[in-house]
Structures are given as C-alpha cells and as structure tokens.
Amino acid sequence: MTDGAAKPQADGKQPLLARMLSWLGASSTSAQTPAPGASPVARARRSEADAAPVIAPLDRMTVAQWLWGDGFIMPGDANYVLELVKPFGLSPAMSMLDLSAGLGGPARVIAQAFGTYVTGLERSVERAKRGMEISVAQNLSKRAAIGHYNPETVELRPNGFDCILGRGATYSVVEKERLLRVLFQGLKQRGQLLLNEFTVDPAHAERPELAAWIARETYPPVLWTINQYSDCLTSLGFETRVVEDVTAQYRSMIVTAWERMLTEVDIKAMARNHKMTIIDEAERWMHRLAALQCGALRVFRVYALANKPAR
C-alpha cells in the first residue's frame, strides 16, 4: 500500500512546530526581529530575550519518554510493540533479539507479557547503560538484558535466537548486507525476522526535505530502496512473507504523540533552556515528517523466515 508523494496535511491544521512556537509565546515576546528566512528554532531563541536562571539541561531521553512512554524512545508505545510482535508467537520457551533496544522499554514489555527471554542491543553506549539499569531495578536483568553493540561489527551466536526484531536498526548501517547475513546466521532454522525500516523512494531521492532530515540524524543514514532489502534478504536465504508500507501509520504516531505532549506537559512554565531542548527535538521530528510527507522517505514492515536446512 502506498501513500503517494507531497500530499497536503489531511487535517488542515497549521504545522506542528509553528503551533508549538505559538504555545511558547515566541511570536509575541520577541525583543528583536528575526532575520528573514531564519529557522523556527532561531526565531524562538530570539524571542526568549529575558534573562533566565541557570538550570540543568533537560535530557533528550526525558523528552522522548514524554512522547512515547517510559523506556520508549521512538514511535510506538507498549500496545503497538505487543501488536507488532504477534506474528512471532512468543512463549517462555523462546528467545528474542531486539536490535534497537533504546532504554529497553520494548524488551521489558515483551518479556513481561510473554515470559520470553529478550536480549536488547543498543548502538548508544549511554542508552544501553541506562536501559540495563532500569531492567535491573525492575528485576528483569535476565529476561530483558540491555547491552551496547556496533551494528557494523556485531557477531551473533549461530542459531541462537528464535526471533529478531529491528525497528530503524539498519538504515544508518553502511554494511547492511553483512549485518543481515549475521542476523540470518543468528536465527534458528525457520527463525523469524521482523524489520520496520526507513527506505528511500528513488523517484524522490533528490528532494531537499530528505537531505535536511539526513543532516540532522545522529548516525548518517545510508538508505536502501525496499527492493534492495527484498533482494538482499532473498540472496541470503530468507523467505520473505510480508512487505508492507507503513509510512502513513508512522507519520500518524509522530503527530499524535506531539499533540498529546503539548496538551499534557506545561511547556510554557519551563525554564528557557528546557523549552529550547523541546523545540530542538520538535524541529528534528519536523524534518523527519517533511521527508516522509514529500514521499522521499518511506517506512516498510518486512517479515521473513530464515530458510535454513533442518539440523
């Protein structure tokens, strides 16, 4: 299923970032007229001319959890994750690998719901450390262990996992084929792989919205088309069962989460530097939304089986 490109917003509302700046009073408190063409963040910063006390910075991971839930740092709450992994048919006898563990929220939710042993791997050292600390505090250090890894060099124990989940786990990996081969080797015979992944639509690859999003990412994206993923998985021995465009759902989750946070969190009462952290985060997500909206960036769900000979 496809959405097409460059559609106007269906709800007719003004852009989310513009509404956020309005909430913060950016347009009415400016002490200095912003230069023409200044970015929304620059305009907001100019508007905060009054002096503010020095307050410890607001952690980006705190903002992420306001958006997505405790222990969650990307679109998709606990209910979404549990629905996503339904095809796995998880049980206490099974083992699962999460390649985008973040702070470990998804791994812990899955472990608690199904009794499955989940290994969570996270590219950020700090997030992995904090995620494991939370698992320990919740007595889930064994069933939802979180550790750091480098996806460019990771190795897995052969035939070690029944299922592997990756949400945005490969789009910034340079050696994608190598990583997918490692995943194939790490799965048991008829083991299951589920990817929710960013891809590029070659017809819109030169769009400036895509370039702007790429420039803001922590790990530079090296995007494949969905056909490249399909061809690579087949060549490695995977049997692909589902390829579904879930871009519209992903966009909707982003907008809904920001709408909710603007309602539930008293941003106006925050210190200036905390407001700026939220606006910076909003601008990052607006770049992602723009790349999705113009059709250059797509999100696909891919479900495949490791078609290995029986041992």
Task: State each model region's role.
Residues 155-164:
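A short acidic, Gly/Pro-enriched loop at the edge of an enzyme's catalytic core
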